[in-house]
A protein has these predicted regions:
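Hydrophobic transmembrane alpha-helices that form the core helical bundles
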Residues: 1-18, 199-214
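Selective recognition of specific alpha-helical transmembrane segments in multi-pass small-molecule
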Residues: 1, 57-74, 111-119, 138-163, ...
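Membrane-water interface regions at transmembrane-helix termini and the short interhelical loops
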Residues: 12-13, 33-56, 71-75, 122-132, ...
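TM-loop-TM module centered on a large, flexible mid-protein loop between adjacent transmembrane helices
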Residues: 154-202, 219, 235-247, 251-256
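C-terminal membrane-solvent junction of multi-pass transporters and transport-like membrane proteins
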Residues: 264-334
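Hydrophobic alpha-helical segments and their helix-loop junctions in multi-pass secondary transporters
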Residues: 2-14, 59-92, 115, 155-164, ...
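Membrane-interface loop-to-helix entry segments
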Residues: 1, 29-74, 81-87, 140-143, ...
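Loop-to-transmembrane helix boundary motifs in multi-pass membrane proteins
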Residues: 23-32, 215-244, 296-312
Length: 334
């Protein structure tokens, strides 16, 4: 979102000076503005956030479709040729070296799992607002399956187009807009990308930890306080993003995060479908007494935590093989 604001400022001739933690003054102003706007939006409550998301989603689709058409018009037949190279596992398509298109598939699959692993754990924070189960199923069908397939098609076309037009793979949508060099598209795209990324931050990075912190210490932390704590932590991480985190690389960072959180989702699924046989005592879920059914041992399910540590260690090791013992390290390294 801050990159979108920086793009807008740059379009009007505002250039940054100086540098701190890898960001110039324009980027810092944009980052602080976006952080403040997110806190304001969060403070207004779930209803305003829902209305904001209903605007942000269609807006980014409009921009991406226009961007795809613009790049396709410039690329001509070269776009489809580059898309074919991506599917054939060409040199510029990414993925795991030496595995061709299957390697590219594995790379995309791991990124998708890493991304959704963080979101799906807190699915209940939003699913509880639906009117009935049928609405939830429709939302999952169109939001996860339909949306991901259609948006992936758009991004695939744009990716192939950037290679054909600019001779290089352009990863950031804001960079693509800047290269197209259309003032109207730049203005609309900046606002749309700003809205979309703020909306994603609300759903994936803001509301879930706010609920989690409030549930962790309900007598001392309410929902809003949890949101402020989250905002402070997010500001620190965001401030270090360019100078520290990006040095790790986007894919390793997302995959590491997914490797830590994905086992939690797996444990939840096994616990519900296999161990508890799809039966939950809802009233007992809110019973914090030591004799409660779900209090376990001191409030912690030690078996679940051991399962998470073991599976998480192996999952993180698939991203960083050097932390694993010989045999496993060689397997994931190769």
């Amino acid at each position: 979102a801050s990159t979108a604001v920086a793009l807008l400022l740059t379009a009007f001739g505002v250039t940054g000076s100086g540098e701190f933690l890898g960001m110039n003054s324009t980027m810092w102003i944009s980052f602080i503005f976006v952080s403040g706007f997110q806190i304001y939006l969060f403070w207004q409550g779930i209803d305003l956030i829902r209305r904001f998301l209903n605007f942000a989603g269609p807006a980014v689709y409009v921009v991406m479709i226009v961007l795809m058409i613009s790049i396709w018009a410039k690329a001509g037949g070269g776009l489809l040729l580059e898309v074919g190279n991506i599917f054939s596992g060409g040199a510029r398509s990414g993925g795991f070296e030496g595995l061709g298109s299957f390697g590219a598939f594995l790379a995309v699959f791991s990124i998708m799992v890493g991304y959704f692993a963080a979101v799906v754990i807190n699915f209940g924070d939003f699913a509880r607002f639906v009117k009935n189960e049928n609405e939830m199923k429709k939302g999952n069908l169109w939001g996860l399956v339909g949306n991901v397939v259609f948006f992936s098609f758009i991004t695939l076309m744009i990716t192939g187009g950037t290679i054909a037009v600019f001779g290089e793979y352009v990863a950031q949508p804001t960079d693509m807009v800047a290269k197209v060099d259309n003032m109207l598209l730049t203005l609309v795209a900046a606002f749309a990308f700003f809205a979309a990324t703020v909306g994603i931050n609300m759903v994936a990075n803001f509301i879930p930890p706010a609920y989690d912190l409030a549930n962790l210490m309900p007598s001392k932390i309410n929902f809003r306080t949890g949101g402020l704590i989250t905002a402070i932590c997010g500001f620190v991480v965001g401030g270090l993003w360019v100078s520290v985190i990006t040095q790790m690389g986007m894919f390793p960072f997302v995959n590491t995060l997914g490797a830590i959180l994905a086992p939690v989702f797996g444990i939840m699924i096994v616990d519900y479908y296999v161990i508890k046989n799809e039966k939950l005592d809802v009233n007992a879920l809110y019973n914090d007494k030591p004799k409660g059914k779900y209090h376990y041992n001191g409030g912690f399910n030690h078996k679940g935590m051991v399962a998470w540590i073991i599976s998480g260690y192996i999952a993180v090791g698939s991203v960083w093989p050097n932390i694993l013992p010989g045999g496993l390290s060689d397997f994931f390294a190769n």
